[in-house]
Amino acid sequence: VTDWPDVRFRGTVEGFYGTPWSHEARLRQIDFYGRNKLNTYIYGPKDDLYHRHRWRMPYPEEEAQRISELAIYAREHGVNFCWAIHPGVDIRWNDADRDTLVAKLESVYKLGVRSFAVFFDDISGDGTDPARQAALLNHVNRVFIHKHSDVTPLMMCPTIYNRSWSTDNDKY
């Protein structure tokens, strides 16, 4: 019997609003994924302050330890743990914010994470500019992703990713 999946990336994005999953629930999810041939867990809960509203700040030690544990546990279970950052709410598109974003990715890399995403969904204003998003992502690729031989290709979520949820007035 030959048994393999047809879909390369199989898993979930924890990218919703509301009460985030507990650490224990995340570990159970990863365990479930490993047992059922799911290979991807993208961590991006909108209510994780250090993922979104406090994206410029490092994780406090206790929360950093949980991220590290998730990355290690996922690897042990054959699951790619991808940590996402969501800077679009208040990014200023200057060198300081660009450098801060790369420094944040480096800090999460030091926790053992080897897969990263940048989310630009659910925002308005300057953060929605696709040219600026592309320039930032290209910079992250050049100075962070390509620097580390053990990091997977960068993922992203654009501002508008589903036309059925947008209006004809969207200028994106």
Model-derived features: positions:
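Feature activates predominantly on carbohydrate-active enzymes
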Residues: 1-104, 110-114
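Catalytic-core regions of glycoside hydrolase
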Residues: 16, 123-172
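Hydrophobic or amphipathic alpha-helical targeting/insertion segments
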Residues: 74, 100-117, 121-128, 132, ...
